[in-house]
């Protein structure tokens, strides 16, 4: 794994702990990337069966979808957290430009690789 992705992962860790310390009240609103019918805003006909996947991350202590800017649809690599400790293993795109390539068991450590131009998110 390259040092740039490690740095990105560490900065995401720091950003996450900082958000918890400050008690971001708007964090939950950032999870509203799904319309009320529970489907992602991308072409994902076989999306995950559990529509609570985004909301479940809030209860893990760190909001996994903080990084998404809903207005612009862009990602900030400094605050990217995807499915930490949930091990849900999504194989299809579930947000614009984001794909989890491999499922991971619960509690496993992983590093996040982020490409600003092509915008794939990978669990390495």
UniProtKB/Swiss-Prot annotation:
Main location: mitochondrion
Swiss-Prot/TrEMBL keywords: Apoptosis, Mitochondrion
Keyword match Mitochondrion: yes
Covalent S-S links between cysteines: none
UniProt cross-references to InterPro entries, sorted A to Z: TP53AIP1
Coiled-coil annotated residue ranges, if any: none
One cellular component term from this protein's GO annotations in UniProt: mitochondrion
Localization annotation: Mitochondrion
Induction conditions: By p53/TP53.
Region spans: Disordered: 1-46
Superkingdom, natural source: Eukaryota
Any GO BP: apoptotic process
Name this protein carries in UniProt: p53-regulated apoptosis-inducing protein 1
Species lineage: Eukaryota, Metazoa, Chordata, Craniata, Vertebrata
Gene: TP53AIP1
């Amino acid at each position: 794994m390259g040092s740039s992705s490690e740095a990105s992962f560490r900065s995401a860790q720091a950003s996450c702990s900082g958000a918890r310390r400050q008690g971001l009240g708007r964090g939950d609103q950032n999870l509203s990337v799904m319309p009320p019918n529970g489907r992602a805003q991308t072409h994902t006909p076989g999306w995950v069966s559990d529509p609570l996947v985004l909301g479940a991350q809030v209860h893990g202590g760190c909001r996994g979808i903080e990084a998404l800017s809903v207005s612009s649809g862009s990602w900030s690599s400094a605050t990217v957290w995807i499915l930490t400790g949930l091990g849900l293993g999504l194989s299809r795109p579930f947000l614009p430009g984001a794909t989890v390539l491999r499922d991971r068991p619960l509690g496993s450590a992983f590093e996040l690789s982020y490409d600003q131009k092509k915008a794939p998110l990978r669990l390495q």
